Amino acid sequence: MKFENCRDCREEVVWWAFTADICMTLFKGILGLMSGSVALVADSLHSGADVVASGVTQLSLKISNKPADERYPFGYGNIQYISSAIVGSLLLIGASFLMYGSVVKLISGTYEAPSIFAALGASVTVIVNELMYRYQICVGNENNSPAIIANAWDNRSDAISSAAVMVGVIASVIGFPIADTIAAIGVSALVGHIGLELIGKAVHGLMDSSVDTELLQTAWQIATDTPLVHSIYFLRGRHVGEDVQFDIRLRVDPNLRIKDSSMVAEAVRQRIQDEIPHARDIRLFVSPAPAAVTVRV
């Protein structure tokens, strides 16, 4: 982690997001109704989904902190992928309703220009949500938390949608009343796309997709550079919530005693944990190299 307090931020960030989302939901909803902006009202529903998403994220972080037990011997880390999928689903469902309502409004021709105050309100929410995105994406990346990263993108989608609302309202005020409704359609398409991306990433995590090739190459290099390691004949890695797990099978000098072989394996494990961020569970299987092989010391 970059800073010592990154772990503390992990415990605080979602509460800040939860509070900000509640304020933004009420602010945009009330201002949208008062100003007559259908896009801003729709955007407030998006923020309402953010409130639920922040609550789900907070719950998943609490559960993922639980230690491994007999029922879940690999820990509770994958609950964060479920949280990410729920957030993505909420965005997708909300976008679908918003798209439907906006298209019906566009076809029927029942639209009128909202007040310019809607644009001012949207500009405030753009700033707040972008700040929350930057805060959460920093904390999420430093803690390798898919749940916090998903929540960050939820706020980024809210910032972008509010920006679209602002443009639509301004265009409506200067003589294009249809622009507010078109902005709502654009917002719904964007939010739906982000929702699908979050769901896709969650599915990859739950299906134990491999870590990046670069990370595997780093682990491979660390292991082969460790003294008395002859070769690596199997290596795989996966994400489990915030942690990275590796399964490594290596060969050592056949003349080594069992105790010494274990010490070599422990050296590999320690180096990987020290040099690869979030590497928590390193599973090693050691076997002797062919007797004729000369091993580097």
Curated annotation (Swiss-Prot):
Domain notes: The C-terminal domain (CTD) is probably responsible for hetero- and homodimerization and binds 1 Fe cation per subunit. The CTD assumes a V-shaped, dimeric metallo-chaperone-like fold.
Gene that produces this protein: mamB
Similarity remark: Belongs to the cation diffusion facilitator (CDF) transporter (TC 2.A.4) family.
GO BP terms, alphabetized: iron ion transport
Organism: Magnetospirillum gryphiswaldense (strain DSM 6361 / JCM 21280 / NBRC 15271 / MSR-1)
Subunit composition and interactions: Forms homodimers via its C-terminal domain, may form higher order multimers that are sensitive to reducing agent. Probably interacts with MamE. Interacts with MamM via their C-terminal domains.
Effect of residue 138 to A: Loss of magnetic response, decreased protein oligomerization
Signal sequence extent: none
Name this polypeptide is given: Magnetosome protein MamB
Principal location listed in the UniProt entry: membrane
Knockout or disruption consequences: The most severe single mam gene deletion. Single gene disruption has no accumulation of magnetite, no intracellular magnetosome vesicles form, wild type levels of MamM, mislocation of MamC in 1-3 foci, MamI mislocalized in 1 to a few patches. Deletion of approximately 80 kb of DNA, including this operon, leads to cells that are non-magnetic, lack internal membrane systems, grow poorly, have reduced mobility and take-up and accumulate iron poorly.
Transmembrane portions of the chain: 13-33, 84-104, 113-133, 165-185
Membrane topology annotation: Multi-pass membrane protein
Cytoplasmic side: 1-12, 105-112, 186-297
Chain segments carrying region Transmembrane domain (TMD): 1-214
Keywords: Biomineralization, Cell inner membrane, Cell membrane, Ion transport, Iron, Iron transport, Magnetosome, Membrane, Metal-binding, Transmembrane, Transmembrane helix, Transport
Function (record text): Plays a dual, essential role in magnetosome formation; required for magnetosome vesicle formation as well as biomineralization. Requires heterodimerization with MamM for stability. Probably binds and transports iron. One of 7 genes (mamLQBIEMO) able to induce magnetosome membrane biogenesis; coexpression of mamLQRBIEMO in a deletion of the 17 gene mamAB operon restores magnetosome vesicle formation but not magnetite biosynthesis.
PANTHER family, per database record: MITOCHONDRIAL METAL TRANSPORTER 1-RELATED
Source organism, top-level taxon: Bacteria
Subcellular location as annotated: Cell inner membrane; Magnetosome membrane
Chain positions covered by the region annotation C-terminal domain (CTD): 215-297
Cited InterPro entries: Cation_efflux, Cation_efflux_CTD, Cation_efflux_CTD_sf, Cation_efflux_TMD_sf, CDF_Transporter, Magnetosome_CDF_Transporter
Induction: Part of the probable 17 gene mamAB operon.
Stretches assigned to the Lumenal side: 34-83, 134-164
Something else known: This bacteria makes up to 60 cubo-octahedral magnetosomes of about 45 nm in diameter which contain membrane-bound crystals of magnetite (Fe(3)O(4)). Expression of just the minimal mamAB gene cluster (MGMSRv2__2365 to MGMSRv2__2381), including this gene, is sufficient to form a minimal magnetosome chain with small magnetite particles.
